[in-house]
């Protein structure tokens, strides 16, 4: 009798131990799953609560969201700007500004109580933990792939994959039309894009933001020497004296809006070096705005393409 009771007691203990181990393993797995990939947490939030309250810590991700018809509850304002970028400001009237991308307003972000936070790895990659204390995060490497890839990724997260694909198709169709218009104007000529600031003259490389839309989407041929630029940098600073070396048939020009930059461009225009450029003498100089042309996002590229279409339709 004693032996049977002892065996029964040991069996009960064994069952309890196994049950405890099972619960511990399940708890460990759940913990690992929630910290290993915070994008999964973001997807779970979406499925449980419908449309998410998204906070975007990247102007480019904000604009990708806008392309899909989604307005983030909060967004950084980007760069040195003191407000949302002009070409999208009217679409962000109900969005809380979260400060510049390099120094976001964490208190304002916390007060928003977002369901999920979108981060740009370049600016927030070292601070993921502090954002995770507020909400699940999804980190994007904007140097990995193109804006199309980023738009598709966001489309998956917000259940708007069809809308993302349609946006890309519409952009491709318009691009083909603009290609034809530009070719009718400059033929197979070479192209360069420059930016005039208060202190320097820059030539854009093949890298984003300017390179992809000119040399990939529109298939234009870079002027001499541009392919030799450091492809990890968006531009190279030059002196006006070397402008003739590029021998460009057409020049796209971005001039900063401040008075100093405007004065510097006027001075450049009056310089014999500028006046002697092939593109200038042929009338193939095209002024463009910093926004949307330097906004490497789905909405930025679409608006830039719209401007190019209008500009070259008049030629």
Locations of the language-model features?
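Extracytoplasmic ligand-binding site segments that recognize negatively charged/polar headgroups
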Residues: 84, 142-154, 189-213, 229-230, ...
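C-terminal motif of bacterial Sec signal peptides marking the signal peptidase cleavage site
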Residues: 17-20
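Proline-aspartate-enriched helix->loop->beta-strand connector
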Residues: 113-118, 136, 243, 247-251
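A short, structured surface patch at a secondary-structure boundary
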Residues: 59-108
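Short, low-complexity, disordered segments immediately C-terminal to signal peptides
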Residues: 9, 22-47
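Extracytoplasmic substrate-binding proteins
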Residues: 130, 134-199, 284, 295, ...
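Basic- and aromatic-lined ligand-binding clefts that recognize polyanionic substrates
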Residues: 53-65, 166-223
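Structured C-terminal subdomain patch of bacterial secreted/periplasmic proteins
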Residues: 249-315
């Amino acid at each position: 009798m004693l032996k049977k009771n002892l065996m029964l007691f040991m069996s009960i203990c064994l069952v309890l131990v196994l049950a405890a181990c099972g619960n511990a393993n399940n708890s460990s797995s759940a913990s690992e799953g929630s910290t290993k990939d915070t994008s999964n947490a973001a997807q779970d939030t979406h499925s449980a609560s419908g449309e998410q309250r998204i906070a975007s810590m990247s102007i480019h991700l904000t604009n990708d969201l806008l392309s899909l018809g989604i307005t983030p509850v909060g967004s950084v304002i980007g760069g040195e700007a003191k407000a949302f970028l002009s070409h999208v400001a009217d679409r962000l009237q109900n969005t809380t500004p979260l400060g510049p991308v390099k120094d976001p307003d964490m208190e304002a972000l916390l007060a928003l109580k977002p369901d999920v936070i979108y981060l740009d790895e370049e600016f927030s990659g070292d601070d993921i933990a502090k954002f995770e204390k507020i909400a699940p995060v999804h980190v994007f490497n904007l140097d990995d792939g193109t804006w199309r890839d980023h738009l598709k990724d966001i489309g998956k997260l917000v259940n708007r994959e069809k809308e993302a694909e349609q946006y890309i198709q519409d952009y491709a169709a318009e691009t083909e039309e603009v290609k034809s218009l530009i070719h009718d104007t400059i033929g197979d000529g070479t192209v360069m894009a420059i930016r005039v600031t208060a202190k320097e003259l820059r030539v854009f490389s093949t890298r984003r933001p300017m390179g992809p839309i000119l040399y990939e989407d529109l298939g234009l041929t870079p002027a001499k020497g541009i392919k030799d630029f450091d492809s990890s940098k968006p531009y190279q600073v030059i002196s006006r004296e070397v402008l003739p070396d590029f021998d460009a048939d057409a020049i796209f020009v971005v001039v900063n809006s401040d008075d100093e930059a405007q004065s510097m461009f006027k001075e450049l225009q009056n310089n014999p070096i500028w006046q002697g450029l092939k593109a200038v003498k042929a009338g193939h100089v095209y002024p463009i705005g910093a926004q949307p042309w330097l906004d490497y996002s789905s909405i930025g590229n679409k608006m830039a393409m719209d401007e190019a279409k209008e500009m070259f339709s008049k030629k």
